[in-house]
Amino acid sequence: MNSMSTTGPIRVAAIPKHYLQFTVRTYTRSMASAGLRYSNPPLVKKCYDQPTGKRFISSTPQSQIKDYFPPPDAPKIVEVKTAWAHPVYSEEEMRAVTVGHREAKNWSDWVALGSVRLLRWGMDLVTGYKHPAPGQEDIKKFQMTEKEWLRRFVFLESVAGVPGMVGGMLRHLRSLRRMKRDNGWIETLLEEAYNERMHLLTFLKMAEPGWFMRLMVLGAQGVFFNGFFLSYLISPRTCHRFVGYLEEEAVLTYTRAIKDLESGRLPHWEKLEAPEIAVKYWKMPEGNRTMKDLLLYVRADEAKHREVNHTLGNLKQAVDVNPFAVEWKDPSKPHPGKGIKHLKTTGWEREEVV
């Protein structure tokens, strides 16, 4: 009796820790993979060259697939116009975007940076992502497929649209409550949220989330929205610094995806054309409408959000004017603006813009 009562626990405890971690990660990645399928059968058949007629990622019959968000059935309407026209980026400006990091200088910065690292850990876990050290990109465990990149993009963009909406909403209510102007912050924050949503809609034209991905997004968005809402009430400066650090991670993610594409690790994307929604939104010119061009545009947007939020984090939240929504006295000098011509990785300091 005694030997039997102790044998079971000993055998369970003898399972190596690394095996348990591998099992959890493998299960998470397989479930997340099952939660994402390509939503355009003709495009997938063309670009993924599946002679058997099966899609690259899916368990759903092709006959059941339809446009994930088809245009509304309104015969009298040609197109829905947006209030925020996207600025035109040049290819030179987009290629000049680099990975960067703003050093934490005070307790507020450290709280923001620590929170981003925690969020990054959770996102890496659910999307199966491992960031390689320099020179380790060719190691198999660090390699990402097109399917895995899309899964990460969809999850990332579904969460990235939350901060701008929360910040804009709270500042809008504050302006109404105090009966004072907001000095241009609301428009920029709402435009940021809209831009992140357009990223998501673009990637959803390429892959349709399944039930598991929807569940992950629902949980992450619910927790993140409420957490960010409360945090913004306590310290808006910390929240903007948090978003600045989060966008640093986004720039890093898209930079690595671009490098993988350029090095031939993502062959199915080499000749893939950007969805029509992306062509119209970014005003992509003829001859520059490939998947690589799309990633360059998205990365440039993330770099702009990085600059904007690091800059807003440097300002006095209650009194300073938003420098990205003003007309400058001397336009010949470099100033913050909607474009990326004078992009600053770590944001503009308060002395430079006030």
UniProtKB/Swiss-Prot annotation:
Question: Its Gene Ontology molecular function terms?
Answer: alternative oxidase activity; metal ion binding
Q: Could you tell me which Gene3D superfamilies the record lists for this protein?
A: Alternative oxidase
Q: Give the subcellular location.
A: Mitochondrion inner membrane
Quote the cellular component terms of the Gene Ontology held in the record: mitochondrial inner membrane; mitochondrion
The Gene Ontology biological process terms listed for this entry are: alternative respiration
| Chain positions recorded as Fe cation 2 binding sites | E196, E247, E302, H305
State which Enzyme Commission number(s) the record gives: 1.-.-.-
Kindly give the membrane topology term recorded for this protein: Multi-pass membrane protein
Q: Where does Fe cation 1 bind?
A: E157, E196, H199, E302
Ranges of biased composition (kind: Basic residues): 335-344
Known InterPro entries for this protein?
A: AOX, AOX_sf
UniProt keyword Oxidoreductase, yes or no: yes
Q: How is the cofactor bound?
A: Binds 2 iron ions per subunit.
Its EC top class is oxidoreductase
Classification via CDD domains: AOX (cd01053)
The residues that cross the membrane are 153-173, 215-235
Q: Where is the transit peptide?
A: 1-64
The alphabetical list of record keywords is: Electron transport, Iron, Membrane, Metal-binding, Mitochondrion, Mitochondrion inner membrane, Oxidoreductase, Respiratory chain, Transit peptide, Transmembrane, Transmembrane helix, Transport
Q: Which cofactor does it need?
A: Fe cation
Q: What is its main location?
A: mitochondrion
Extract the ranges annotated as region (Disordered): 333-354
Q: What does this protein do?
A: Catalyzes cyanide-resistant oxygen consumption. May increase respiration when the cytochrome respiratory pathway is restricted, or in response to low temperatures.
Please give the family membership noted in the entry.
Answer: Belongs to the alternative oxidase family.
Q: What is this protein called?
A: Alternative oxidase, mitochondrial
Protein's organism = Emericella nidulans (strain FGSC A4 / ATCC 38163 / CBS 112.46 / NRRL 194 / M139) (Aspergillus nidulans)
